[in-house]
Amino acid sequence: MTLITRRSFALSALATTTLSACGNGIGGSGSAVIDSRVDSTLNFMYNSYPGTRDLANNASGMLVMPVVTEAGLGLGGSFGRGALRIGSSTVDYYSATSGSAGFQIGAQQFSTVLFFMTQEALTDFRRSNGWAAGADIEYALQDRGETLRAETTTSLAPVIAVVFAQAGFRAGATIEGTKYARIIP
């Protein structure tokens, strides 16, 4: 009889611990933290790359990932959380995840902003269960003092990605193959 009581107690304790770890996140401060980081990231981007302000003004919406952490040693992956902004309002929160295999070593962090230049691209993104970044993205890069211009890049692709603020020791940053999924922070 004592064995059953101990077993029941152990199972009850395990079940209670497991259930207490399953919070739904509603009422937490996760969204406020993400919004604060998104605001800081946008201010940094606008000050460092003034041409991105034109992109933002012409975009139907922007997905801002303030910090994406990428690491690998043979197998690699990345993760970040951010917000979808339409105008100056946050409408949804998203996570970005990716995985890779091959010769790789190192870790880095970077910020990324996806500019949805057409309403159709924004609608497709919002309606998908999990949107994967692929060949339909145009990367806007700033090399040799050139400025980013919305007029020249808008016609190239419906989604424009800007990757900036890289820190770490891994060669290059890419969002290709990254899956974006809606979250409740």
Residue ranges: model-predicted function:
Residues M1-A21:
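N-terminal secretory signal peptides and thylakoid transit peptides that target proteins
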